[in-house]
């Protein structure tokens, strides 16, 4: 069975300007939205940096494994930014809110693949206590 890593090997050489985003790209963007880019990606939509640059800053963090859902997310980030397709995707408009006293969690990030579109992804329920409570309160 093929996975996102196989897809990156197969189509990683095709920039988004050549072939626009497809469902597998959206899955990759959604998965990457679970990475905690606090202090790396700006909340300001006008301060766009390449995903490669965000990854470089993230990957040197000593506690990076605590800032992801699963370790495979780190591997996916590394694999993605080592492709022509994802390396220069812009990222900004990042927001991560974790407010236990309000039982609130929210996270979103915007990707700019370079084909004239903006892709906004929202992080779903995570494995924090707030996420667990949020899931059970539905």
Language-model segments: residues:
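A conserved cap/lid and substrate-binding interface adjacent to the catalytic center
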Residues: 53-138
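N-terminal low-complexity, Ser/Thr- and acidic-residue-enriched intrinsically disordered segments
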Residues: 1-72
């Amino acid at each position: 069975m093929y996975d996102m890593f196989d897809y990156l090997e197969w189509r990683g050489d095709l920039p988004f300007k050549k072939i626009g985003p497809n469902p597998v790209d959206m899955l990759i963007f959604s998965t990457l939205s679970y990475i905690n880019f606090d202090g790396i990606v700006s909340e300001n939509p006008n301060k766009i940096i390449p995903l490669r640059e965000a990854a470089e800053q993230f990957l040197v963090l000593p506690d990076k494994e605590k800032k992801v859902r699963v370790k495979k997310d780190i591997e996916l980030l590394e694999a993605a930014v080592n492709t022509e397709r994802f390396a220069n995707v812009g990222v900004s408009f990042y927001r991560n809110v974790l407010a236990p006293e309000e039982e609130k969690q929210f996270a979103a990030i915007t990707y700019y693949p370079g084909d004239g579109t903006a892709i906004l992804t929202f992080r779903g329920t995570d494995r924090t206590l707030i996420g667990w409570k949020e899931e059970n309160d539905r």
